[in-house]
């Protein structure tokens, strides 16, 4: 399978989006289509053996729109995500496109208003009692009034010709859009007005001067057509401006990337180059205050790096030789050199931007209902408008009243409000998530997370740091009560025995010794005893390190209950012996993260059941669980990596929606099995297989924040869908005159156009409220 992105031109409303989707979905070999109305783009998964990008573009063209490939022939991974696409940071962002559209629309709007003001004044002045020049009030000059209105209308029609071109084109293709509603409504007003002018001409020719003036006053709708076009443009302009703000998070990420960087040659000379020209393996220098241009590994120097743009973590991270640095993070203090490892589309920044854009290109399940409604909305509105015209003619016999209501129905209807409700909120929600270091890979993941009833936490690397550390150093006591050796001597003994071991516990002990400046001595006759520990000889001394079983086999007495006490605290004790006597104990534990207990409390406050899954024995697992506020019933212990997926499935079979949180190292099957998989603390490796959501930081609180953001986003979408349906449900009958017997009031097409424009603006504005989202469970 391949996945391509296409730029799609000519889409103006939700109906357009639905038509493009249908046209491409019908092609053989197309697996899925996701059309993004906001970005004017389309993401297509297809079989290259059955259909080509040219075939897809042709299908879009036949539907009445234009399409061109942005990326082609990209192979997709098993999870469907694109690999090796062009660097997102170097693509034109949707925000830039929308700003360009808004700029052109502003020019159209200014011209429209310049001509609309005199047109409206002249056309409505006689009804509102406004003073008018005698040339427009004298009965003998009634044709002058009509011709002046027509001349003022022509520039408005000219600058807004896109409504007519796109609208009638959609009618020809049998797929009417919102532009068709505007085009037919405005055309009907203009056509009736032109017909009235011919009647006026006949009346003037027959000397019926007064009748001609009355015909003009009652039947000229040029100002209505001009007002409809201008108000729709006002609404479109405001809508486009608002939509351009929804992509602010992506735009901010793109702007973080520096344009130039400093390359350090082998002879030490430094040269400023464009970031696009950097190759993996090159050495670069970064000075205080500069943004890091690409991903890499520090070679010399040290500094504090601000990674908040990528992870949301406000505290700068200390970096020294051997540490990784990422593009778009900011060097705060010292100067350092680093070797480039990932450039262009492979950097963390580019991958984050691509993830956010891919999420925006997908559809949330909640959008399907709106898409179905939008697909049939316009034809239904045309039918209602026709019925309205016929009904008014039958009841009143007045073409004016029938035309007024029929046109009002056309222009008040707004499929855009329905179509915008979901994609705008998804774009703002995923963008806000990116700002917080929470990356949703799809709109479906964003929606599904709100329904999660159980969160399963993988212990190692999720609840705990995933890196064992020394917690206790206990020196043994001789029979006379004196210490067997000093604490430093015990650590020297431990270092000598553990320096050759690759066991994680040995690494923890060596790290502690390094911190204290203790250098490991050389030993002889080193031997590993499987499942027990190690033995060796240091000079004339026989030394050993291991568990209780090894000590027992060596005839060394260990104080009763000591091993059990450490195990109950979630610690692993290592016993050290010298010449047949116990020298001391060093306890090692995988430390619990500072925020894990707070995160468990936060998840409970959201009504979520929390479970911990681990391969540790139950005693150790329950000790960790107690420290974070979990009961023994909420612990699933002694689980092999291959069995984690089975335990998640069992929870699902019990009727729970499950979110699995892990580091993506040995729990990928469980992440994939869960209703929502969250990979935590992945840093630069953001494309974890199986994960639906990537949490950039190692903070478990982000799980609670992600659930809150999901709920806030879907709540926002439901609000918009409700008001869009409510607006159309009330507005269309009102325009048709259903309430006329009660109110005695007939809705003007001009008010209908204003209401239609405001409805879309309101939907977008409501979605923009998500930009100020703050989780209630924040620290």
Positions of PLM-derived features:
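ATP-driven catalytic headpiece of P-type ATPases
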Residues: 107, 329, 453-502, 532-611, ...
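Juxtamembrane coupling segments of multi-pass membrane pumps/enzymes
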Residues: 200, 204, 209-211, 226-288, ...
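Soluble-to-membrane junctions at the N-terminal ends of transmembrane alpha-helices
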Residues: 91-114, 166-189, 353-386, 402, ...
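Transmembrane helix-loop-helix hairpins at the membrane interface
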Residues: 102-260, 372, 473, 744
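Flexible metal-binding regulatory segments at protein termini and peripheral loops
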Residues: 1-146, 156, 243, 269-272, ...
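Membrane-embedded alpha-helical bundles of multi-pass transporters
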Residues: 128-143, 172, 176, 191, ...
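Conserved ATP-binding TGD loop and adjacent catalytic N/P-domain core of P-type ATPases
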Residues: 1, 281, 288, 362, ...
């Amino acid at each position: 399978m391949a996945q391509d992105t296409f730029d799609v031109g000519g889409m103006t409303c939700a109906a357009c989006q639905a038509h493009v989707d249908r046209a491409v979905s019908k092609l053989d070999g197309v697996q899925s289509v996701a059309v993004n109305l906001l970005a004017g783009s389309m993401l297509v998964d297809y079989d290259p053996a059955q259909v080509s990008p040219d075939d897809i573009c042709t299908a879009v063209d036949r539907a009445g729109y234009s399409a061109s490939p942005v990326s082609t022939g990209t192979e997709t991974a098993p999870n469907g995500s694109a690999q090796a696409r062009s660097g997102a940071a170097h693509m034109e962002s949707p925000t830039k496109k929308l700003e360009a559209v808004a700029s052109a629309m502003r020019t159209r709007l200014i011209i429209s208003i310049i001509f609309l003001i005199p047109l409206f004044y002249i056309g409505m002045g006689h009804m509102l009692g406004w003073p008018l020049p005698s040339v427009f009030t004298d009965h003998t000059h009634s044709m002058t009034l009509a011709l002046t209105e027509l001349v003022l209308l022509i520039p408005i029609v000219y600058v807004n010709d896109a409504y007519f071109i796109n609208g009638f084109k959609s009618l020809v293709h049998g797929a009417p859009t919102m532009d068709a509603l505007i085009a037919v409504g405005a055309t009907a007003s203009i056509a009736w007005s032109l017909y009235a002018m011919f009647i006026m001409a006949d009346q003037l020719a027959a000397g019926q001067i007064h009748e001609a003036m009355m015909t003009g006053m009652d039947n000229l709708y040029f100002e209505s057509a001009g007002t409809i076009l201008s108000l729709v443009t006002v609404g479109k302009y405001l809508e486009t401006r608002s939509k351009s703000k929804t992509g602010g998070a992506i735009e901010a990420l793109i702007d973080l990337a520096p344009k130039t960087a400093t390359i350090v040659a082998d002879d030490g000379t430094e040269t400023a180059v464009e970031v696009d020209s950097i190759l993996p393996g090159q050495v670069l220098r970064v000075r205080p205050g500069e943004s890091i241009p690409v991903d890499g590994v520090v070679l010399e120097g040290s500094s504090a790096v601000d990674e908040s743009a990528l992870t949301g973590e406000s505290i700068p991270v200390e970096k020294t030789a051997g540490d990784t640095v990422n593009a778009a993070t900011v060097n705060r203090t010292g100067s350092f050199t680093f070797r480039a490892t990932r450039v262009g589309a492979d950097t963390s920044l580019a991958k984050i931007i691509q993830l956010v854009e891919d999420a925006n290109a997908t559809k949330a399940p909640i959008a399907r209902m709106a898409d179905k409604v939008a697909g049939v909305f316009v034809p239904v509105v045309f039918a209602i408008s026709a019925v309205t015209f016929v009904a008014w003619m039958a009841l009143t016999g007045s073409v004016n009243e029938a035309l007024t209501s029929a046109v009002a129905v056309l222009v008040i209807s707004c499929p855009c409000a329905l179509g915008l409700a979901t994609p705008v909120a998804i774009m703002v929600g995923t963008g806000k998530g990116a700002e917080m270091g929470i990356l949703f890979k799809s709109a479906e993941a964003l929606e599904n997370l709100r329904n999660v009833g159980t969160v399963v936490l993988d212990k190692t690397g999720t609840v705990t740091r995933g890196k064992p550390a020394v917690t206790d150093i206990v020196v043994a006591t001789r029979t006379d009560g004196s210490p067997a050796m000093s604490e430093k001597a015990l650590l020297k003994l431990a270092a000598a025995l553990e320096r050759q071991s690759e066991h994680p516990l040995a690494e923890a002990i060596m790290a502690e010794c390094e911190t204290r400046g203790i250098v490991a001595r050389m030993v002889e006759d080193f031997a590993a005893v499987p499942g027990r520990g190690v033995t060796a000889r240091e000079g004339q001394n026989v030394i050993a390190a291991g568990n209780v079983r090894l000590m027992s086999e060596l005839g060394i007495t260990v104080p009763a209950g000591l091993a059990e006490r450490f195990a109950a605290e979630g610690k692993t004790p290592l016993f050290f012996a010298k010449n047949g006597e116990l020298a001391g104990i060093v306890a090692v534990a995988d430390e619990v993260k500072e925020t894990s207990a707070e995160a468990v409390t936060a998840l409970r406050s959201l009504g979520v059941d929390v479970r911990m899954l681990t391969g540790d024995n139950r005693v150790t697992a329950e000790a960790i669980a107690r420290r974070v506020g979990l009961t023994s019933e909420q612990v699933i212990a002694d689980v092999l990596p291959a069995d984690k997926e089975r335990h998640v499935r069992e929870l699902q079979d019990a009727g729970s929606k499950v979110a699995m949180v892990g580091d993506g190292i040995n729990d990928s099957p469980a992440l994939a099995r869960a209703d929502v998989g969250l990979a935590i603390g992945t840093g630069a490796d953001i494309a974890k297989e199986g994960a639906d959501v990537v949490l950039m930081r190692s903070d478990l609180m982000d799980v609670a924040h992600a659930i809150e953001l999901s709920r806030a986003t879907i709540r926002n979408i439901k609000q918009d869908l409700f008001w869009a349906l409510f607006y159309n449900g009330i507005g269309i009958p009102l325009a048709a005159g259903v309430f006329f017997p009660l109110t005695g009031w007939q809705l003007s097409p001009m008010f209908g156009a204003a209401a239609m424009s405001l409805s879309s603006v309101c939907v977008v504005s409501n979605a923009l409220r998500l930009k100020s989202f703050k989780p209630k469970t924040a620290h």
